[in-house]
């Protein structure tokens, strides 16, 4: 089963938008046992798209097109595919109802060109859009099938997961399937992680082990090809156990959509605990990161951004003498910030971030960061870290390290 992905959009060719859809679709199709042999990007040009379709149908059983389903004249994917297949475009009634409902609720006039979004290819199956207005299409002509999806990832991904995947499973049943498990690691670089599990990688067959470096973390994707899903999961578990026996100290969670922040928030939710923070160099980034996670309001009452020495004294009540003696970038300051914040917010935990993201300060080089951790009924501690690269990387690295310190403190109590 050979598939091809065609991304439509001049903005992709100009580099104005990164084609993340191809990555998502390739992984999803592979999981269904469908091999992707070609990926192509074409601009909003009907002639070039027509030429590409003619080439693609000579070499692929499934052609997946993403983008060009919107309301404007340059959104021409459906029109070109329909013309190529000598088929008409018809209005989808369900999509039309949702379109009218959207504009009625938003109290905006609906222009005529919006009707283009609810056109589907005659004789095909319509894919409803749970997060947008443009419907998709799935149509088979001869030995070639065409799947049309919207371009925005926040529309393409739900449409694929909810509508396209079941259609593809029915249309292209496979004897074997690929199932994957993603392991996430923090505090170890890709090169070190690969070195630690080199013997496993060198002898991998089924499952396979694929490392991926991400900002401030590393993931491993374990993938098995199997006819039996239960047996496949058992193989993944056996491989996971071998991996974690070597690098388990750095493991924090599973899944593509997971994060260190989400895992930490979930732990606090499970324990019914709260956290606050006093931030200097991170300027609220830690608190903002918590706020991105669902359920954060239950574990985070509020916090403090104390960038200057004056605000550390006035907002947190840290003594002028302590700051003059030890400096703001110090263990003593970090401890006081964490404990004062915890007391003021009446939280179970208090974190603090103080350091140097810009030019050297108080004799401390750029990248020096002290992170304090206060816990009700426990001695307050602070650790010093040294991060490289630019200002934002230093700040983001500090937040990640703070999350990991808190996560480890919580799980070590279990």
Curated annotation (Swiss-Prot):
What's the protein name?
Putative competence-damage inducible protein
Write the signal peptide boundaries.
none
Q: Which Gene3D superfamilies match?
A: 3.30.70.2860, CinA-like (3.90.950.20), MoaB/Mog-like domain (3.40.980.10)
Q: Which Pfam families match?
A: CinA (PF02464), CinA_KH (PF18146), MoCF_biosynth (PF00994)
- From what superkingdom does this record's organism come? Bacteria
Family as reported in the entry's similarity comment: Belongs to the CinA family.
Q: Which CDD domains match?
A: cinA
| NCBIfam families referenced in this protein's UniProt entry, alphabetically | cinA_nterm, molyb_syn, PncC_domain, PRK00549.1
The record's InterPro entries line, in alphabetical order, gives: CinA, CinA-like_C, CinA_C, CinA_KH, Competence-induced_CinA, MoaB/Mog-like_dom_sf, MoaB/Mog_dom
């Amino acid at each position: 089963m050979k598939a091809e992905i065609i991304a439509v959009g001049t903005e992709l060719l100009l580099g104005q938008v990164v084609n993340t859809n191809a990555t998502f679709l390739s992984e999803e199709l592979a999981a269904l046992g469908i091999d992707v042999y070609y990926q192509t990007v074409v601009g909003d040009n009907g002639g070039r798209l027509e030429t590409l379709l003619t080439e693609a149908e000579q070499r692929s059983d499934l052609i997946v097109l993403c983008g060009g389903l919107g309301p404007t004249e340059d959104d021409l994917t459906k029109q070109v595919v329909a013309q190529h297949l000598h088929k008409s475009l018809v209005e989808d009634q369900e999509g039309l109802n949702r379109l009218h409902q959207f504009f009625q609720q938003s109290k905006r006039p609906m222009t005529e060109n919006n009707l283009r979004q609810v056109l589907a290819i005659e004789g095909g199956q319509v894919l409803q859009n749970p997060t947008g207005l443009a419907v998709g299409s799935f149509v088979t002509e001869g030995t070639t099938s065409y799947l049309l999806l919207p371009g925005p990832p926040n529309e393409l991904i739900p449409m694929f997961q909810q509508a396209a995947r079941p259609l593809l499973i029915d249309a292209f049943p496979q004897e074997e399937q690929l199932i994957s498990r993603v392991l996430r690691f923090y505090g170890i670089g890709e090169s070190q992680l690969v070195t630690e599990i080199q013997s496993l990688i060198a002898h991998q067959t089924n499952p396979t082990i694929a490392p991926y470096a991400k900002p401030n973390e590393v993931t491993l994707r374990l993938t098995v090809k199997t006819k039996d899903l239960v047996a496949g999961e058992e193989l993944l578990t056996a491989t996971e156990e071998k991996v974690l026996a070597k690098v388990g100290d750095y493991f924090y969670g599973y899944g593509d959509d997971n994060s260190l922040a989400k895992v930490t928030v979930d732990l606090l939710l499970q324990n019914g605990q709260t956290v606050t923070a006093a931030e200097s160099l991170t300027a609220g980034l830690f608190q903002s990161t918590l706020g991105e996670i669902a359920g954060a309001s239950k574990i985070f009452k509020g916090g403090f951004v104390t960038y200057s020495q004056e605000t550390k004294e006035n907002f947190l009540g840290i003594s002028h003498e302590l700051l003059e003696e030890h400096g703001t970038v110090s263990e003593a300051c970090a401890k006081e910030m964490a404990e004062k914040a915890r007391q003021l917010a009446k939280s179970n935990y208090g974190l603090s971030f103080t350091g140097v993201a810009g030019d050297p300060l108080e004799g401390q080089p750029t990248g020096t960061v002290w992170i304090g951790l206060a816990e009700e009924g426990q001695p307050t501690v602070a650790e010093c870290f040294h991060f490289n690269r630019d200002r934002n990387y230093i700040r983001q690295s500090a937040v990640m390290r703070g999350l990991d310190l808190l996560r480890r403190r919580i799980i070590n109590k279990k």
